[in-house]
């Protein structure tokens, strides 16, 4: 049996290199002459000469079908060889003509993925930093004329009073400073000289306070301060000034009564009035300090000075008022002293009761008015120490009225029974009352200084105002703290809707121009430039959205003075 002809194809090879004929004969015995005859009949060389071709291809060989040979053996007789379907000369020549036809070559299309090269910025990168003109002049020892030659960039202003301001690239300023001064060492020497000159200049200014104030006003480091005198004609300042005047007079007359009578209860009341007068003077100092305008060292202002002065006042009441009253009462119990006529003491206590009661009414009316304005109850307003100065006056005058009642009662018992121990017990009672007041003041003012949240209803209102904006998805980590003087600081993490922010940017763009820019993009570098341009503008739009929300919060809630919205 003759197996099939195995064919393989390759470009630009002859017919003889593509066709290979293997003949196998299964005859048990075959004469060499017969075998040679058969091989001469069907030879690869003669067949290849029959089909001359210089450009064969794989698909054409399927048309050539050869062969099969039947070898019959009868004993030792001769063999017959038969070749089936051997191609004729015309067929082979047709195949050769086909193979000579030029091949149709199609262009190869290879998809290559464009990858943007990653930039390595390192641990420190300042090439894109902006600085203001003032910083450029001060830090790099330049002049205004030097900055005129640099590229100017307009950016959004972080201050409420201006919309935008001019900045410069830090790299441009550094290059300009090196051009002016020649080397970093020369620049460092110049900065050192200017620093020394500035220190010397300030030392000269400190010798004259008037020149120093004019210098600060000229530089604009601080805004004009509020007149402290006007603070004491309204609100808590008015209450404090009334209390200082009345308690000062009461202290003077109580000391006269104590000197005249020698009563321990009267001594406690005199000490009580003295401590009240000193503490209220401290409150007045805190009020005058709290209205100062914020400066670079205290960016959130001095409103906490009211709480600080109230805290010190509470400590002073405990040490001076309660301590001396307990000491004098204990000494009266251990060493009783005879008491003179108490008539003048009763008169002074009566006058003190009237005056302290009047001051108490002034403080109560002020607190009620403020509590009503805040939408809070009187009790809650007092317990949370929303107005620390008036709170101190309220508690001190309440303690003063109760102290007068305690002292008058104990002195009356002493007058009736003639036992001075009742008078000493009255001194201990007044001291205990002052200790309770001081403990309450220390606790409430400490809580206020630690940072206290505003009312939950107010926090909810501020949060809903932000959540109702289309550009906001969600609000997280809300913190709203009371800074004192009716000022609130609001902080929140804001999850912005990127689609809304992007649409806000696109609404201000010329779509025809953008479409033309897109059509001009042909290379990855051009695509990068296009994306960076609009990406930076979208980031600026996001910053503008943050500024808009902050202004909206302050406009609808005047008590909110500081807003920090962080992008989540």
From Swiss-Prot:
Tissue localization of expression: Ubiquitously expressed in fetal and adult tissues and cancer cell lines.
Xref: SUPFAM superfamilies: Cation efflux protein transmembrane domain-like (SSF161111), Putative DNA-binding domain (SSF46955)
Main location: mitochondrion
LXXLL motif, short sequence motif: residues: 462-466
Gene3D superfamilies (alphabetical): Cation efflux protein transmembrane domain, XPA C-terminal domain
Coiled-coil region(s): none
Bilayer-spanning residue ranges: 239-259, 314-334, 342-362, 392-412, 424-444
Keyword terms: Antiport, Disease variant, Endoplasmic reticulum, Ion transport, Membrane, Mitochondrion, Nucleus, Transcription, Transcription regulation, Transit peptide, Transmembrane, Transmembrane helix, Transport, Zinc, Zinc transport
Pfam family, one: Cation_efflux
InterPro entries, A to Z: Cation_efflux, Cation_efflux_TMD_sf, DNA-bd_dom_put_sf, SLC30A9, XPA_sf
Listed GO biological process terms: intracellular zinc ion homeostasis; nucleotide-excision repair; positive regulation of transcription by RNA polymerase II; regulation of mitochondrion organization; zinc ion transport
CDD domains: NTD_ZNT9 (cd21078)
Disease tied to this entry: Birk-Landau-Perez syndrome: An autosomal recessive syndrome characterized by early-childhood onset of different combinations of intellectual disability, muscle weakness, camptocormia, oculomotor apraxia, and nephropathy.
Functional description taken from the UniProt entry: Mitochondrial proton-coupled zinc ion antiporter mediating the export of zinc from the mitochondria and involved in zinc homeostasis, zinc mobilization as well as mitochondrial morphology and health. In nucleus, functions as a secondary coactivator for nuclear receptors by cooperating with p160 coactivators subtypes. Plays a role in transcriptional activation of Wnt-responsive genes.
Quaternary structure annotation from Swiss-Prot or TrEMBL: Interacts with GRIP1, ESR1 and AR.
Name listed for the protein in its UniProt record: Proton-coupled zinc antiporter SLC30A9, mitochondrial
Source species: Homo sapiens
